[in-house]
């Protein structure tokens, strides 16, 4: 039986990796082995950072809410506790947006939270 070489399969796989490596510097975009290493690392970073982005935005929102709440005389935890007791169902993304763009509206929320504590 004749030996078969993996010509088409290998060529297709290499082309796929080199296409993903387009725009990389030097051998990383021209040669398969460094391109493959770089692409695998890039895909790993992309997956990791998609998950980290969610955590980072939540941290940013909490920091903004905390700063605005402290300007109105409450800590973050007291403010969130007061909102929960008052039955206000706003997530942290919306609260942070209100804190940045509508100081008067945020002050009203703080007063509502203070009243329910």
From Swiss-Prot:
Binds directly to 23S ribosomal RNA and is necessary for the in vitro assembly process of the 50S ribosomal subunit. It is not involved in the protein synthesizing functions of that subunit. InterPro entries: Ribosomal_bL20, RIBOSOMAL_L20_CS, Ribosomal_protein_bL20_C. Disulfide bonds: none annotated. Belongs to the bacterial ribosomal protein bL20 family. GO terms for cellular component: ribonucleoprotein complex; ribosome. Keywords: Ribonucleoprotein, Ribosomal protein, RNA-binding, rRNA-binding. One of its GO terms (molecular function) is structural constituent of ribosome. Gene3D superfamilies: 6.10.160.10, Ribosomal protein L20 (1.10.1900.20). This is Large ribosomal subunit protein bL20. It comes from Symbiobacterium thermophilum (strain DSM 24528 / JCM 14929 / IAM 14863 / T). GO terms for biological process: ribosomal large subunit assembly; translation.
């Amino acid at each position: 039986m004749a030996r078969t070489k993996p010509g088409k399969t290998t060529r297709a796989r290499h082309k796929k990796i080199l296409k993903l490596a387009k725009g990389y510097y030097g051998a990383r975009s021209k040669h398969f082995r460094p391109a493959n290493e770089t692409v695998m690392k890039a895909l790993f970073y992309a997956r990791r950072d998609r998950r980290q982005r969610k955590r980072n935005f939540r941290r940013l929102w909490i920091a903004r809410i905390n700063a605005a709440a402290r300007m109105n005389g409450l800590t973050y935890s007291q403010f969130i506790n007061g909102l929960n007791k008052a039955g206000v169902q706003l997530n942290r993304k919306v609260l942070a947006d209100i804190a940045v763009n509508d100081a008067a509206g945020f002050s009203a929320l703080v007063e509502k939270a203070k009243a329910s504590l």
